[in-house]
């Protein structure tokens, strides 16, 4: 199928059909049809003479019913001129599709005799194949489209089960949807459940994320009706995130996944659409855009994997029958950057493969500019061995797939044994124009030259006729042969005088049984290009039809003795016309049928059984993992049982076992050899000593979910500059770079597998595979002398680097400065970037345009390092052109969603300002809150921005030991900031006591300075710890435990179990940590946090701290142990280890039940001072590493590391079971995080469910699990879903009030910033938290609407006014109800009229302020108190044509949840009018302070 977007053009394509040759009987009949535009998408309906093509310019479609002799335009309905693409059904010879423009399409079910139109409310997707076909039911098709509104586009997938008679929406926002049964062979030989025929797989975004690394693979057997689909259990039944796409090949369905922080892919395979297994490639890495699934056999997959990223070469692999284990066939295959591989299986003959390989691969690997020398190789045994192609005694090399010049297969066709190609003899392949046409009629064993020069070629009548056309320039002749290319005749094309064409396509019907061919070519006439479609018919050249004596029994494969060879248990023969027979077969539409003779079984008929892999010598099959003996068979290690030999007969192999090998015969196995070794039941310890006294730093190169292997790699640099590496988490260490002076190690910022080891000279080494191999590189200059990193890394391109080096800094008299260079191949070649820079950085592409080359640099003004002005400049073309954003900056920071710049003022005493960009192109000045009292803004700390908002710490007091500042939070585009929390502590280095909880969005903790007034007078700081569960909108104190770990009460009391200023839990935070990696929480242990601190009024010194734990994300805490401990999480929180901090010890404490109970373990005979405890960053390992020194009696000198291995512990020796369909059926349960101030359990407007291991289950989690299971109910909006708007600040009772003397942002800006906007809303003091998904409920930010200029008509349609009787009832009924309810409330209410307390929640009964009978009437009650003024205002407001609006409930349950921030904005039509004078009605000028509210909300 060829898909091309076509341009509309005037004029008709078909001009003439007048040139026909009237040849005598010794030549073919040739008919020429002239076209004005280039024909494209030409195809035959299989087993017919019906051919179709598409106008390459004006969107017309043509059909020929006589193999191209006569063409007619398809003029059905509105099809003429509307075709976008034309394609046949790949598995149904009667069906084809014309995909049109504007959602109109056509289908034929009778080879273009009739057409039926169908429509879809979407355009065709430019990112995916438009049609996806079912492998066994041609009426089942999916259409992948896209629906756009302005610049907002949503991908939509539709399906039909009746050949497009009806069409249904399958899902929105799904990509790469595929039928489970995608090929005719899928499931053959298996007893698949009936529902698999309906099963569809789709790639969808993550539940909380749009990043590709969070994509999920969902499937449904009900077309995604009534459910959101089930997540496919790709890895041992567990879901895997980061699914890129799916693909099908014969009997297999494949899914490729990529984890965050690696470009290594994992390939998962299934042959039944239920059980998936990870494919193993004999130790070879598979990387993104670095593998190609090739034409596979009926019994194996063949995949070419890129072997070197510096040039296009690969390794060919072949799988076993279930696609799980791959073995190498041949190295250094030739491929191109588009993923095409020089590989072809010879059609109709099993086991013969033609490939091209790179002869000078070593030179090519060293330099990408070295030209490849390509040689051809052929295999006759399914890729086990390869040999050169031979033309006589010379090696022959042929052009293949990477530079194919024709449709379809390159070398072969269904004509048995006939193979052709363009190439040359000699040492390697030359240019195409230097090639000749070669042919083999024995399936590639022997070759001979057929014609000089390059030709296109095609086979007909099962090989009786071969046609060739000159392909190095223009021609007006064709060549043909009736004797397998031994001799050739020529025929002239009946073209106009002096016209010669350049051949574009030469083709025939797919089965090569016809005597008719179609040639497409173009000729230049003056300034125009003319196009011709030429029908060539040999049917009348021979009258005789072949009979038996004209045929031979031809063996498809021969062995080295030139005898018929066996493959898949049989010999293959064809009844083939003899080369010199003077006849035509004339069996059009009848494919050649092979005959088979069975063979006795040999070793080649067997493959490794499931759970076995080939041994290193390839002669036997050894267990890939521990075997399971039959139940009850192994009671003692010395027992024996009968089990698999390790081999099995390849499925589909027809060999005869009698008299042959029976490698699959069960054998006797010893239980001690094959049983899984029982857990020793103990923790294992490995201690290692080093000569250095201490370590300078260490870091992990951690495997990701898609990484192969089982290493846990740690790299350490000691205080003596020695570099050590351990691949087994510190059990064994190896020194590296002993002869080199490594001065710095720079792990790749974005890819876990990569690290760079640098010297002061500019030479260095790097690893791409977590320390398994190291390669050397040379930088253009020594590292810079600005104490800044020499390397800057690209977020998406692993091999793109920027090197900032020092020039003229060797005392030569020049001006020392920094120069930046870039490379796209890890330093193999460097290119100049910028001079006189301080630093340069790549900018992440996502949501910031389409260019990978966006680079930001800080450059000194006028390239003068003495200048005090540092400019921020950017470029998208390596600074061929540049853009200056700011002329005088202090620094800039790149974050996941924003680029934030600190800008200096004109004078030294001026405050800093902030600039923000989300696309790297346009910057806006950040609007900082005026209620942050900062005399001069001198320092900012950029925190994080993973929740669609940026957090900044703005320093208020910068005096040493008295530093603190305000925590401010942005809106979704980073430009408008509001105060989140005052007086947040920071240290002299600029670090703030602020930390977000890992694994759970919106939860963060901060330490505040509680005695600000005293600190301003010089007093020491006193701290309190605060927590937020709605991303900084509301903060509360930490609730203290009821009792300590020894059961004693604390010396202070709470109020109703809630914290007070005098009694709360306070924890030591970021600024007091020796290692900032020691965080409260873990990405794997969702909901758990550990910290050291105390209960009381303030945080006390660390020396008196105890250790506390929470298991519900900070809502409740308990004391884990008395004293201060260092902690680390393992196995995603199923193991927690505590080690005393600052106290010598021989023992550690560990918990297997999330800290509910603790056990002591002695890890050393000598007391040690433990400096740190570590594990892999994801906290998924069962290994821990202690770093310290022996200090007790009998101590050894030097640094010691102690590996603590829990994998042998009996309680952690069995893998936990997670069933995605029934997530709570086995070892896991679903945990819902909650908001402490919301009784309904909602957090960010929804209820999310996370997988957590049941604490009582004795098993281990293993590799990182996908914790987030689902997002359940969407909640109504409450106060917790809003934060204070710009220039508003929170009050003690939780409401938001405008800062006195300041104005809100101009709300009308939405009209100018968004041309599609219809309305704007008056400021209310509230704005939605960007992370919330809430729907309905309190719409605190959208109450009073007004039309945008010149949008009054659209506004009126959106908000129709009440008229007539409707208006009367709108006035009278509310007043009557208000009077009645108001009177009742007046008798029962507590007298606090005129007070709106938006921060309060709870179920306070019938007359609670959130009660539906009170929350609205109370505003009117407030008006009744002043009825003389309020009522006229109410009445008059109803007559205003542009009044404000309040929400009117719709159909309720039919609504869909908001899927994005834009989705909420799009529902502004759900509101109708109320009064403009609402503030006066609500009495908001009379709000009072409330001590009770202060204590309840914990607001500071």
From Swiss-Prot:
Main localization of the protein described in the UniProt heading: Golgi
Membrane-crossing residue ranges in chain numbering: 1365-1385, 1413-1433
Residues of this chain annotated as glycosylated in UniProt: 298, 322, 810, 973
Residue span of region Disordered: 1481-1500
Residues on Cytoplasmic side: 1386-1412
Main function: Functions as a sorting receptor in the Golgi compartment required for the intracellular sorting and delivery of soluble vacuolar proteins, like carboxypeptidase Y (CPY) and proteinase A. Executes multiple rounds of sorting by cycling between the late Golgi and a prevacuolar endosome-like compartment.
InterPro entries in UniProt: Sialidase_sf, Sortilin_C, Sortilin_N, VPS10, VPS10-sortilin, WD40/YVTN_repeat-like_dom_sf
PANTHER family per UniProt: SORTILIN RELATED, SORTILIN-RELATED RECEPTOR
Lumenal topological domain residue ranges: 23-1364, 1434-1500
Compartment list: Golgi apparatus, trans-Golgi network membrane; Prevacuolar compartment membrane
Species of provenance: Blastomyces gilchristii (strain SLH14081) (Blastomyces dermatitidis)
A cellular component annotation (GO) from this entry: membrane
Gene: VPS10
BNR repeat residue intervals: 378-387, 438-449, 480-490, 724-734, 821-831, 1108-1118, 1150-1159
UniProt similarity note: Belongs to the VPS10-related sortilin family.
Protein name, as recorded: Vacuolar protein sorting/targeting protein 10
């Amino acid at each position: 199928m060829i898909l091309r977007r076509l341009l509309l053009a005037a004029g008709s394509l078909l001009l003439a059909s007048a040139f026909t040759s009237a040849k005598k009987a010794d030549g073919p009949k040739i008919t020429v049809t002239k076209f004005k535009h280039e024909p494209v998408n030409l195809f035959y309906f299989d087993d017919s003479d019906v051919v179709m093509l598409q106008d390459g310019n004006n969107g017309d479609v043509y059909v020929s019913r006589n193999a191209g002799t006569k063409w007619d335009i398809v003029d059905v309905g509105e099809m003429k001129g509307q075709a976008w693409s034309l394609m046949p059904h790949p598995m149904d010879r009667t069906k084809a599709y014309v995909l049109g423009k504007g959602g109109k399409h056509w289908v034929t079910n009778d080879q273009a005799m009739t057409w039926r139109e169908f429509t879809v409310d979407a355009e065709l997707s430019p990112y995916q194949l438009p049609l996806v076909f079912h492998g066994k039911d041609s009426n089942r098709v999916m259409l992948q489209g896209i629906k756009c509104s302005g610049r907002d586009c949503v991908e939509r997938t539709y399906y039909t089960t009746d050949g497009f008679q009806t069409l249904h929406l399958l899902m929105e926002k799904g990509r790469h949807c595929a039928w489970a049964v995608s090929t005719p062979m899928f499931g053959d030989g298996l007893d698949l459940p009936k529902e698999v025929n309906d099963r569809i797989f789709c790639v969808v975004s993550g539940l909380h994320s749009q990043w590709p690394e969070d994509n999920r693979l969902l499937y449904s057997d009900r077309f995604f009706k009534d459910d959101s689909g089930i997540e496919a259990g790709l890895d041992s039944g567990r879901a895997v995130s980061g699914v890129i796409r799916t693909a099908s090949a014969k009997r297999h369905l494949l899914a490729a996944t990529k984890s965050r922080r690696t470009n290594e892919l994992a390939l998962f395979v299934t042959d039944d659409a239920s059980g998936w297994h990870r494919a193993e490639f004999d130790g070879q890495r598979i990387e993104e855009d670095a593998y190609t699934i090739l034409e596979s056999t009926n019994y194996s997959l063949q995949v070419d994997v890129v072997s070197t990223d510096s040039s296009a070469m690969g390794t060919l692999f072949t799988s076993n029958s279930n696609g799980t284990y791959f073995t190498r066939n041949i190295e250094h295959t030739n491929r191109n950057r588009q993923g095409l591989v020089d590989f072809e299986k010879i059609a109709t003959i099993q086991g013969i493969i033609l490939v091209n390989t790179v002869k000078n691969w070593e030179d090519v690997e060293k330099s990408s500019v070295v030209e490849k020398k390509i040689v051809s190789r052929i295999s006759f045994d399914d890729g086990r061995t390869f040999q050169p192609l031979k033309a006589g005694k010379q090696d022959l090399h042929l052009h293949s797939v990477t530079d194919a010049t024709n449709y379809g297969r390159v070398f072969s066709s269904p004509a048995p044994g006939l193979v052709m190609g363009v190439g040359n003899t000699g040492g390697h392949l030359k240019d195409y124009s230097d090639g000749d046409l070669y042919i083999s009629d024995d399936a590639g064993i022997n070759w001979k030259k057929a014609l000089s020069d390059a030709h296109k070629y095609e086979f007909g009548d099962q090989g009786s006729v071969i046609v060739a056309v000159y392909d190095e320039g223009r021609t007006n002749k064709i060549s043909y042969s009736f004797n397998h290319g031994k001799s050739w005749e020529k025929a002239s094309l009946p073209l106009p005088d002096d016209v010669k064409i350049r051949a574009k396509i030469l083709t025939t019907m797919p089965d090569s049984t016809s005597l008719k061919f179609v040639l497409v070519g173009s000729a230049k006439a003056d300034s125009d290009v003319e196009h011709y479609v030429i029908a060539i018919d040999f049917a009348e050249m021979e009258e005789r039809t072949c009979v038996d004596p004209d045929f031979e029994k031809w063996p498809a494969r021969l062995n080295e003795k030139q005898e018929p060879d066996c493959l898949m248990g049989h010999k293959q023969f064809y009844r083939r016309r003899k080369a010199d027979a003077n006849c035509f077969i004339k069996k059009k539409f009848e494919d050649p049928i092979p005959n088979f003779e069975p063979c006795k079984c040999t070793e080649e008929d067997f493959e490794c059984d499931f759970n076995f892999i080939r041994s290193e010598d390839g002669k036997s099959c050894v267990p890939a993992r521990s075997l399971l003996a039959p139940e009850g068979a192994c009671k003692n290690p010395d027992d024996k049982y009968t089990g698999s030999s390790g081999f099995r007969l390849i499925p589909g192999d027809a060999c005869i076992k009698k008299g042959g090998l029976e490698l699959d015969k069960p054998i006797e196995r010893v239980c001690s050899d094959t049983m899984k070794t029982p857990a020793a039941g103990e923790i294992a310890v490995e201690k290692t000593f080093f000569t250095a006294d201490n370590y300078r730093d260490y870091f992990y190169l951690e495997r990701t979910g898609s990484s192969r292997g089982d290493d846990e790699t740690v790299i350490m640099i000691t205080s003596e500059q020695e570099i050590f590496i351990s691949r087994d988490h510190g059990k064994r260490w190896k020194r590296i770079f002993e002869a080199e002076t490594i001065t710095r190690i720079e792990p790749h910022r974005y890819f876990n597998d990569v690290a760079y080891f640098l010297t002061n000279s500019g030479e260095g080494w790097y690893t791409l595979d977590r320390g398994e191999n190291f390669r050397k590189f040379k930088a253009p200059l020594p590292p810079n002398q600005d104490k800044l990193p020499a390397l800057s890394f690209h977020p998406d391109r692993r091999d793109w680097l920027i090197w900032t080096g020092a020039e003229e800094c060797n005392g030569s008299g020049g001006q020392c400065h920094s120069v930046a260079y870039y490379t796209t191949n890890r330093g193999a070649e460097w290119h100049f970037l910028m001079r006189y820079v301080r630093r340069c950085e790549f900018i992440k592409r996502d949501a910031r345009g389409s260019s990978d080359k966006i680079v930001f640099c800080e450059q000194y003004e006028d390239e003068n390092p003495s200048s005090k002005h540092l400019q921020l400049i950017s470029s998208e073309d390596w600074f061929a052109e540049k853009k200056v954003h700011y002329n005088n900056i202090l620094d800039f920071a790149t974050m996941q969603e924003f680029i934030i710049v600190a800008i200096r003022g004109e004078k030294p005493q001026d405050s800093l300002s902030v600039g923000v960009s989300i696309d790297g192109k346009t910057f806006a000045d950040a609007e900082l809150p005026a209620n942050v009292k900062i005399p001069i803004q001198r320092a900012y700390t950029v925190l994080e921005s993973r929740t669609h908002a940026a957090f900044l710490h703005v320093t208020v007091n910068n005096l040493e030991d008295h530093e603190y500042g305000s925590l401010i939070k942005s809106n979704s585009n980073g430009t408008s900031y509001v105060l989140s929390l005052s007086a947040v502590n920071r240290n002299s280095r600029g670090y703030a006591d602020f930390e977000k909880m890992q694994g759970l969005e919106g939860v963060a903790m901060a330490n505040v300075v509680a005695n600000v007034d005293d600190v301003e007078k010089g007093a020491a700081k006193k701290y309190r710890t605060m927590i937020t569960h709605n991303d900084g909108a509301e903060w509360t104190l930490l609730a203290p435990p009821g009792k300590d770990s020894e059961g004693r009460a604390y010396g202070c009391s709470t109020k109703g179990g809630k914290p007070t200023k005098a009694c709360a839990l306070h924890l030591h935070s970021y600024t007091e940590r020796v290692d900032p990696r020691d965080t409260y929480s873990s990405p794997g242990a969702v909901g758990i946090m550990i910290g050291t601190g105390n209960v009381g009024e303030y945080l006390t010194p660390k020396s008196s701290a105890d250790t506390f734990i929470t298991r519900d994300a900070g809502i409740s805490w308990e004391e884990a142990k008395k004293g201060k401990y260092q902690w680390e999480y393992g196995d995603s929180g199923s193991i927690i280890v505590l080690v005393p901090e600052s106290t010598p010890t021989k023992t550690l404490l560990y918990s297997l039940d999330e800290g509910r109970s603790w056990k002591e373990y002695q890890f050393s005979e000598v007391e040690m001072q433990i400096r740190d405890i570590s594990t892999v960053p994801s906290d998924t390992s069962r290994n821990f590493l202690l770093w310290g020194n022996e200090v007790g009696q009998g101590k050894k000198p030097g640094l010691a590391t102690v590996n603590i291995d829990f994998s042998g512990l009996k309680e952690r020796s069995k893998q936990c079971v997670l069933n995605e369909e029934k997530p709570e059926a086995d070892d896991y349960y679903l945990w819902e995080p909650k908001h402490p101030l919301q009784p309904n359990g909602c957090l960010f407007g929804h209820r999310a469910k996370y997988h957590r291991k049941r604490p009582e289950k004795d098993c281990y989690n293993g590799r990182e699990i996908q914790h987030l299971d689902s997002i359940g109910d969407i909640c109504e909006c409450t106060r917790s879903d809003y934060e204070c708007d710009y220039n508003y600040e929170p009050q003690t009772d939780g409401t938001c009030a405008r800062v006195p003397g300041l104005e809100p942002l101009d709300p009308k800006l939405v009209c100018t910033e968004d041309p599609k906007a219809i309305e704007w809303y008056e400021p209310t003091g509230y704005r939605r938290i960007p992370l919330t998904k809430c729907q309905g409920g309190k719409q605190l930010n959208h109450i009073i609407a007004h039309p945008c200029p010149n949008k009054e008509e659209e506004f009126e349609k959106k908000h129709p006014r009440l008229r007539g009787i409707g208006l009367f009832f709108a006035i009278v009924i509310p007043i009557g109800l208000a009077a009645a309810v108001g009177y009742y409330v007046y008798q029962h209410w507590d007298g606090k009229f005129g007070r709106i307390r938006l921060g309060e929640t709870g179920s306070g009964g019938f007359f609670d302020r959130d009660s539906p009978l009170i929350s609205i009437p109370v505003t009117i009650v407030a008006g009744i108190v002043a009825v003389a003024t309020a009522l006229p205002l109410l009445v008059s407001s109803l007559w205003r044509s542009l009044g404000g609006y309040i929400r009117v409930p719709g159909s309720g349950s039919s609504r869909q949840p908001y899927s994005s921030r834009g989705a909420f904005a799009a529902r502004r039509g759900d509101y109708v009018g109320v009064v403009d004078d609402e503030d006066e009605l609500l009495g908001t000028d009379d709000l009072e302070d409330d001590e009770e509210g202060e204590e309840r909300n914990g607001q500071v």
